[in-house]
Amino acid sequence: MFNAVKADMPDDPMLARRYGQCLELALEACQDTPEQFKLVETPLKSFLLVSNILPQDNRPWHEARSSGRVAEDDYDFSSLALELLPLNPRLPEEWQFGGQGWSSRMEPSQPEMGMGLCFEVFDGDLMRIALAWNKDEVIGQALQILAHSQTWTSLVPEDPLPWMWALFYGPRSHCEERHCVYAAARGKRGPILLPTAVYTPCANIEAFLAHLTRCVYALYLDVRDWKGEDIAPPFDVSRLNKMAKQLCLLPQEPFCITRVCLLCLLHKQNLNAQYKRPVDTYDPCLILTGEAERYMVDAVGNYREASTGTTVLYPTYDLGSIVADMVTYEDE
């Protein structure tokens, strides 16, 4: 056989030795399994190892069956003795042989799903609304839509203004973090982060009202008399007391709302990624999209769901740039 390596690269002993080893291995494979591998010398000074992916499997009983000489009943397996395990009486009847047994019918258990992460997506407009203390534009849009009678079907809040004021400007509408990033940057604690549906009443007024009532319920359920609160609403306090009575009419559904601002959540998300700390599943994982993607940095955090084994990646952001841009849209 012609040695192509020696002809092309005679001064490379390492390549020549590797060539010889590969060729020797190919010859051994062809000799051991001639029906699966064939070594072909090409006119281009090289060798081609051809493999048959589906080799012929000729077994004696296959030939006998194909020719019709031996039937399946001719094979005698009476000498085989396999020990059988006792039947589990706790299995459901339909799972037991013959349908006999005293067990009651059981439903197959559903696979347990992990809690996972709660993702919240914010574009540039939503991020500006979430960071701004002035929510008059959102309240004005909601009141304009609610001025029409067709939007008041089976709704609990007969007077929506106290509900919106309590959520956006109430005594429990500011961040409760010990070291608030918003307070360090702007001199006062930031507004708590709310579901995105609360910031866009024009998109779906029913979703806005549903989240509005649930958030107010979670924040102010224990407040019975608003006259004792140190507040100054732009309307009579009796409207807030009426709202407190209507809170008891809402269904007691579990609803969790974290009294944390957007900057503190982003800061916590950055720290989790930097120090590989476990992610708190009660805090949402924030994803900034649209024009807000420019705040994203190269560092990426990861979260592994223990029950499912899946790994989730989440981004980190430049808080300095976000705070610097807040000057243009956050009212003093």
Swiss-Prot record:
<keyword id="KW-0597">Phosphoprotein</keyword>
<dbReference type="InterPro" id="IPR004280">
    <property type="entry name" value="Herpes_UL95"/>
</dbReference>
<comment type="similarity">
    <text>Belongs to the herpesviridae UL95 family.</text>
</comment>
<feature type="modified residue" description="Phosphothreonine">
    <location>
        <position position="42"/>
    </location>
</feature>
<dbReference type="Pfam" id="PF03038">
    <property type="entry name" value="Herpes_UL95"/>
</dbReference>
<protein>
    <recommendedName>
        <fullName>Late gene expression regulator BGLF3</fullName>
    </recommendedName>
</protein>
<comment type="function">
    <text>Part of the viral pre-initiation complex (vPIC) that is responsible for the expression of vPIC-dependent late genes. vPIC is composed of at least BcRF1 that binds the viral TATT box, BDLF3.5, BDLF4, BFRF2, BGLF3, BGLF4 and BVLF1.</text>
</comment>
<comment type="subunit">
    <text>Part of a trimeric complex composed of BGLF3, BFRF2 and BVLF1.</text>
</comment>
